[in-house]
Regions:
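Charged, low-complexity intrinsically disordered terminal segments
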Residues: 2-435
Length: 435
């Protein structure tokens, strides 16, 4: 038998290709850390108790704090003018971190405000994600840098670092003078303008925070900035004394816990915070998420609470979603949730991109994290847990306003979906670790 002789360079590239394929498949299909099969606890305190907040702080490795205010802002019509106003009022520092930044009207207005701030001698820094920020207007970015602005990119694509590339910086943290900040689901792209009036304008929420809540956002920004840019940000201009700012508020003072997560560690607190907060529910639990692919432990606690007679409702996107495969993966779990009594709705007018939980009208979670494995294990994320009835009431009212424009999924009809749809769901769920 004749033996085929291959050039050494061909053998090298074959071996390199096989190793690259094995590495990619390992990264895609193996979880970052081993999850427990279930969480157990005889009783979790109610969300309005001090014991609950201390338990939350324990699993999040973050302290319970008091002070600061939170104001809910729905859709670009509300939050974008507030962001621009805060930029225009900044006196010392602006730190701007978002996942997506794409050229357009919204980008132009933000750059205009940031460049004017630089001319006022305000220090301005931007963190861009190496994947989500690639649509930015390069010309405007150069003008910004020439005016004195600083920019860093989180994990841009590099050959040999592809297993790190798929772990993204998904955090949202916009902070002015260390005292006023914004957190939520929105980013810099024209689809976040307007009032969700059509499919070209998304439904989303941001939260304006002040005081110690804003300082927590500052920490989420500075952690990424220091690790990526190599500059330590210290001093009163980043962490001002709160006393001199008291009284400049929109709402009542709140107790809160701020959580930031990173893929560099096997400690992933967001999943634990989600579970504990849902477990603590006594009457009603309302979730709104753009991407919903929970692991088994989170699905089980949602089903458990629904079987207890708690009003558990989940609001998700319909086919206006910007990624059909994640929606199909989500659909795989609808039947088991509906059978347990969970009520599921799909928002009809446009893509809904909000990321919120409100429990018993007393406790809320807002931030960048989705209800999926990518957010709990892979991405850098930041969320804010707020124990304040006024804010929770605003969030709950918004939830029911959104339900007026949503279609409820019914178990009987859902069971009749086609064989093709079921196969599609199973195929999509193979990649649920990555959505």
């Amino acid at each position: 038998m004749e033996i085929i002789s291959l050039p050494i360079w061909v053998i090298f590239f074959l071996i390199f290709g096989i190793l690259a394929l094995v590495t990619a498949l390992t990264a895609l299909f193996f979880p970052i850390f081993s999850r427990p099969k279930k969480y157990t606890n005889s009783e979790v305190p109610a969300v309005d108790s001090e014991d609950f907040l201390q338990a939350l702080a324990g699993v999040a490795n973050a302290p319970v704090q008091s002070g600061g205010q939170a104001k809910l802002l729905n859709n670009g019509e509300q939050f974008f003018p507030e962001i621009l106003e805060a930029i225009n009022k900044a006196e010392k520092t602006i730190n701007f971190m978002t996942y997506i930044w794409t050229k357009g009207k919204m980008s132009d207005l933000v750059f205009e405000g940031l460049i004017k701030a630089l001319h006022r001698k305000v220090e301005v820094r931007i963190v861009l994600d190496g994947f989500g920020g690639t649509g930015i207007d390069d010309e405007k970015l150069e003008i910004f840098k020439k005016a004195g602005g600083k920019v860093c990119w989180f994990r841009p694509a590099h050959l040999g670092k592809l297993t790190r590339f798929y772990r993204r910086n998904h955090r949202r943290a916009i902070i002015m003078d260390g005292f006023v900040g914004f957190i939520g689901g929105a980013a810099i792209e024209d689809k976040w303008l307007g009032n969700a009036e059509n499919p070209e304008h998304w439904r989303d929420s941001m939260v304006k925070v002040t005081g110690s809540m804003a300082e927590n956002l500052q920490s989420a920004f500075i952690q990424v900035w220091t690790d990526t840019y190599g500059e330590f940000l210290v001093g009163r201009k980043f962490y001002p004394h709160q006393g001199k700012h008291e009284g400049t508020t929109d709402s009542t003072t709140s107790k809160h816990v701020s959580i930031i997560s990173s893929p560099s560690s096997e400690f992933h607190p967001i999943s634990n915070v989600f579970w504990l907060s849902i477990k603590a529910g006594r009457e009603k639990i309302y979730l709104t998420y753009s991407y919903f692919v929970p692991d088994k432990t989170l699905r089980n606690i949602l089903k458990e609470k629904a079987r207890e007679g708690i009003d558990v409702r989940i609001l998700l996107p319909n086919d206006y979603i910007d990624g059909n495969t994640i929606r199909w993966a989500s659909h795989r779990y609808f039947e088991e949730l509906l059978q347990a009594g969970v009520k599921i709705y799909e928002y009809q007018p446009t893509m809904i991109h909000s990321k919120t939980i409100v429990v018993d009208g007393k406790f809320s979670i807002v931030g960048s994290a989705n209800f999926d494995i990518r957010s709990t294990e892979l991405n850098k994320e930041n969320i804010l847990c707020i124990a304040e009835k006024g804010f929770a009431s605003d969030l709950e009212n918004t939830f029911f306003q959104d339900l007026k424009h949503a279609k409820q999924m019914k178990l009987g009809a859902w069971k009749k979906r086609s064989f093709f749809r079921r196969i599609r769901e199973r195929f999509a769920s193979l990649f649920e670790e990555q959505y």
